[in-house]
Amino acid sequence: MTRILLLLLTFYRYFISPLLGGNNCRFYPTCSKYAKEALNTHGGIKGLWLIFKRIIKCQPLCDGGYDPVPLTK
């Protein structure tokens, strides 16, 4: 599952994101880099949950800033 999600993420980063204007993320690391790190660190299920929470925060009413992937326990 993680490999499929990483493949979809790579497709998004190289083919869809440039069509949307490139880097528009309010956070560091960017949402796509965060997603890749979350999937590699936490696997598919928890990684998807972390990605979902991050994307919900990536909107005009949020200040953004530094928001790293949480460490594993």
Curated annotation (Swiss-Prot):
SMART domains linked to this entry: Haemolytic
Annotated NCBIfam families: membrane protein insertion efficiency factor YidD
Pfam entry (one): YidD
Principal place of residence: membrane
Subcellular location field: Cell inner membrane
Membership in a protein family: Belongs to the UPF0161 family.
GO cellular component: plasma membrane
Highest taxon of source: Bacteria
Protein name per UniProt: Putative membrane protein insertion efficiency factor
Physiological role: Could be involved in insertion of integral membrane proteins into the membrane.
Organism field: Rickettsia bellii (strain RML369-C)
Keywords, sorted A to Z: Cell inner membrane, Cell membrane, Membrane
Topology relative to the membrane: Peripheral membrane protein
